[in-house]
């Protein structure tokens, strides 16, 4: 794994942790539970995977170093319990850290407020 990829992963992860900390009260008000599913860092790949659960649906936020997936660094998906259409956001190979964080923030806010 390239050092540049790991640095980008770490920057995204750090900002996501801050974003969730800033939304902690709002998550609590909306009875949304958070579970850290995976927090792995090694020489080959890094994973930080969070699940959010409410009485309306479940969400998974994944941050990884690039590997063979439909996204590059980040993925956010929501599955609604009332069978509404699922929500997906995937970054692209040329997405900047700022773009990724903006879209993850927007996605998490959408889940919290729905």
Question: Which residues does each PLM region occupy?
Answer:
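Ampiphathic alpha-helical segments that act as solvent-exposed interaction surfaces
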Residues: 2-27, 81-114
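Amphipathic, interaction-prone secondary-structure segments
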Residues: 31-77
